[in-house]
Amino acid sequence: MNLMRTAMLLAFMTVLFMAVGYVIGGRGGMMIALVIAAGMNFFSYWNSDRMVLRMYRAQEVDEHSAPEYYGIVRDLAKNAGLPMPRVYVIDSPQPNAFATGRNPENAAVAASTGLLHSLSYEEVAGVMAHELAHIQYRDTLTMTLTATLAGAISMLGNFAFFFGGNRENNNPLGFIGVLIAMIVAPLAAMLVQMAISRTREYSADRRGAEICGNPLWLSSALRKIAGAAQVIHNNDAERNPATAHMFIINPLSGERMDNLFSTHPNTENRVAALERMARETSTGSTAPVRPDNAGRKSRSVPRTGWGRGGSEPPKGPWS
């Protein structure tokens, strides 16, 4: 099903890309846009994960440079029956995280330094379990390809303003068509992102809670991340808004309501769903992830440890 959705998504984005090309240069522009879109789809399939990681200047870590963080991901991947993904750290004060990769065998997870500094061990486990759920459901391919193509469509819409405003460029619609392309193309790309992101967050929350073994760990983390995202800006995300739907919580400023134009479901709705899940099941479907006590002698992020940052999270078996 996810493969079919991905194919339909790519087809829609390609048609949208061609439509903007038609506005810029008529039939010739449309054909050029088709060739470019086909090349981008092929390139994005193989390279979009590296492109997104590069956008955020993510640094890969291992069991030596970030033993606690790496150990959490390793244990959760084992719980989920997934191959070990590559593990990255993003230097950003805003607590957040995302997953990327075309399949579970070529996946990566990334957490910000702000997340590792401000969340407890249990909360980080809940967050990373959510990201592994996206990998298990193969959401990461669709999310990453969408981010790449949506960004390209937005740029092409802006490009139309400078080069498509007259009929001498084979533009059959003139300046009015350019204005439509500038407004409609980025908006349509954004709506596609919202459609694929909002429904998948709930399913990833539920599966993530099963992977880590306690829905309340994730619900506590979501509250903290959402609160911090309102006051701590993510400058890289603001420069690359097409990637916003990839994060566990919308990293952009100005997102408050669960409405048509939100890339994520309302946080309180997600928390309520997780709390219902916790009440329905006294124990998770898998054993709670437990820390590697030897690894906990070292810091997960250089010169930092696990901060409690406000209200205490639900206690884990090691607390």
UniProtKB/Swiss-Prot annotation:
Q: Where does Zn(2+) bind?
A: H130, H134, E201
> What cofactors does this protein use?
Zn(2+)
- The residues that cross the membrane are 6-26, 28-48, 145-165, 172-192
- Protein's membrane topology: Multi-pass membrane protein
Listed HAMAP family: Pept_M48_protease_HtpX
Question: What EC number(s) does this enzyme carry?
Answer: 3.4.24.-
Q: What detail does the entry give on cofactor binding?
A: Binds 1 zinc ion per subunit.
Question: What protein name is recorded for this chain?
Answer: Protease HtpX homolog
PANTHER family linked: PROTEASE HTPX
Q: Which family does it belong to?
A: Belongs to the peptidase M48B family.
Q: Does the keyword Oxidoreductase apply?
A: no
